[in-house]
Amino acid sequence: MNRIDQEQVSGFTRVLRSVVTILCLGSVFAAAQSAGPSHTITTIASTVPGNGDINPYGIVVVPQTTGKLIQGNLLISNFNASSNFQGTGTTIVQISPSGQRTLFAHIDPDHLPVTCTGGVGLTTALVALRSGWVIVGSLPTSDGTSATAQAGCLLVLNSSGRVVESIYGTLINGPWDMTAMDRSSVNGGGSAALFVTNVLNGTVAAHGSVVHGGTVVRIDLKLSTGAAPFVQAMTVIGSGFAERTDPGALVIGPTGVGLSRDGFSLYVADSLNNRIVAIPFPLTRQSSANTGMTVTRGGALNDPLGLNVAANGVIFTVNGNDGFMVQTAPTGLQVAKDQLDSSGNPPGAGALFGLVTVGQSVYYVDDATNTLNLFQ
């Protein structure tokens, strides 16, 4: 548990104006100090489907029962095929909290009905809307190396797991993670705003050197009953994030994203700079906030990747380098850390990616064991 200095919380003191918030954060900090040993980790199920896809990345809770989707189940996207080549995974599995696994979608790159530059390699970018649409990012490779990585797209699937549309273009370049403000209804109407991190802007050409081309793009969708989502606008709201290719991780750059409870901030895991930043007014801004404002840096963070905002506003992230999960208050105070995976050398490195909070619990995927797990 670590405190950060005054510079790191600059610009965020307004979040703490209410006494209620201060008291709540104090309670969270006290609980984190006293409850650590009582936490348990339970393996729910393997994430490996029949075709052998591995390396689970994205995870999201199904918000509404429709088609093949069952409310409360978890959808998980796989980044690797059975060959263990990164950027070749083609499946999304659905797992119930009791551990029953079914195949939600197998997206055949040889028979893709839509445009997706380079093919299929499903990333952490995964959302499920109340209207039944599932949207997943693709950052494909042909041989598992960054040399063959291509721009990909966002694939839009219906509630039966069938691809009906793709979102692509110059602003979509290696979609790595994603969250959404869902204003859709169960009958299919309404709207949604997607927030996508992109990590391939100049990275492949730099051959491992750091470039500052990572972006966060807002995609405004109009949803109509009986029709595929319609893209009304795409806006770069964050830019200049550090990114580079990596022989082990394929690519490193801005990863997890999550909206604050009031929608006034979009938190971004700035992995290479080992910090969490906030982009102000993400739902309405029409220009880039560059890399936003630093919420917290260093401390227990160690290559923050997946990010999720809990109902109480606390920011949960998982580290790529040591297997720890870190909890950070909106003020920037790191209130707790827990080790979710200690396997490998160094312990926990490369094991964690996607996570989602449900009440007082956290579901997360473990790449080292190819499993869905529950922390509570």
Regions flagged by a language model, labelled:
Residues 1-14:
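N-terminal secretory signal peptides that target proteins for export/translocation
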Residues 17-28:
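Bacterial N-terminal signal peptides
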Residues 34-52, 97-120, 156-175, 222-225, ...:
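Surface-exposed loop and turn segments in beta-propeller and other repeat-based domains
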Residues 48-72, 87, 108-134, 140-141, ...:
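Beta-rich, blade/repeat-based domains predominating
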Residues 79-81, 138-141, 149, 183, ...:
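Short loop/turn segments immediately following the C-termini of beta-strands
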Residues 84, 92, 154, 203-204, ...:
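Structural signal for beta-propeller blades
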Residues 89-98, 149-161, 211-222:
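Beta-propeller blade signature
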Residues 271-275, 294-338:
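Loop/turn-rich, solvent-exposed surfaces of beta-rich toroidal or solenoidal domains
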